[in-house]
Amino acid sequence: WKIRAIPFPSKESHEMNPVILKLKKKIKYRIDMSFLSNAYKDASKLSSQIISYGNKQFKVKELFSIKGSDIKNIIIKSSVDLMDNIGKGLNNINITVHGNVGYSFGEQMLSGKLILYGNALDYAASGIKGGSIFIYGNSGDYTGGKTNHGNIGIVDGFLYVKGNIGNNSIERMRRGNVIIEGNIGDYACNDMLSGTIIIKGKIGKIFAEGIKRGTIFTKDKK
């Protein structure tokens, strides 16, 4: 059990020159932020990446102000819940987000670190295969569970949530470690195959049904 070996991050960045993104203006359409998970040669390649917004296409630098040069360490400031897929498939990159995020935060992450100082919508940390995710807020349904197009939950990695998580969370977990400080919704931890889960708050209905192996710690006696 390796939870104690996971270093919890501080809120201040210690990177020398991280890439910092901030929206230039308020948005009204959803943005697919999965482009941040690409392997860019330098920050100029990132800023020139074409993304869709509404029914048009823009370069990243047209929607976001960008500064810094370390593309392995990214900070997003003033994030909003219209920004989906941040850290999706992330591999060997660290992303820190200040604000709320949309759907599929860290979905199928491979390695690296994701830190969120805000709330996440559904499917956060779904199907992750490695790395560490820290959510210092609440997270929606299917957190740490199956992706919206698959049937496998957490394969490996570490997930920490400071607040509450929603229904159908941490389903079909295969390996990894999870800590939930708050409450957990209905139909959670079902069909667990292995891994370790700590839940400090209350648990919902139909909890840990079909569990085969693994360890769950909870204070809720029901």
What are these regions (language model features)?
Residues 1-222:
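Long, distal/terminal scaffolding or interaction modules
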